[in-house]
Amino acid sequence: MLADGLSGPLPGGPFTGHALRHVCVGTAGPALLVVARPLTLALRLLPPGGVRRGLLRAAHSPPAAWLLLPPVAAVADVGGLWALYRTGLAAAAHHRPWLDGTLHLHKAAAGLLFGSAICQLDPVRRRRSTALRATTLLLAGTAHAVPAKTLYATGPPGTAFAAADLRAGAQVMYYGGDAVEVALALVLAVGWYTAAARDGPATPRGDGDSPPLTRAVPPRRWGSCR
């Protein structure tokens, strides 16, 4: 999906095609990659040795833990979106292929970082609480929806897209982003439910499972018989 989004023509007008590429590269593609657990897969495939230890050490390093803090990952993801569509960056990238490619790489990296911080399926240094991750996902979804709605009426500064093309692209970004955020919420909910079932208290035995109670009978002394 990332390769399809980065290469080849897409249906619709110029901005609609751009929006489809944005959804593939920046949201849907990274989300699918997060669910595939790339770090876990790499650790299983690599033989024991320096490369495997180095990868695990990098994943558990303080910088990685800081980048995987959900609010930090959300700012990197949503902040880039606002900078692209509410400044002259989109117009500049239209005339500079190297800048356009750099922005697509940033979208993919920021989307992967955000999805990893929310889902936390791979082994990380510190696992954040479900409440923090869910709240961050909700706020990031709201912040993502605002520029998508504003693009319905006003294009990025310095661009001149047709009104119909602009509206279609804005709808693709709005509903595509919502669909991916719902998928991330489902992954988060399944992880919370699984952890709660695994760490929950043991089920007490019912009355039917309890052993029968018997009254202790003192031993009979033969000398007391008459």
List where the protein language model places each region:
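Alpha-helical membrane segments of multi-pass proteins
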Residues: M1-R226
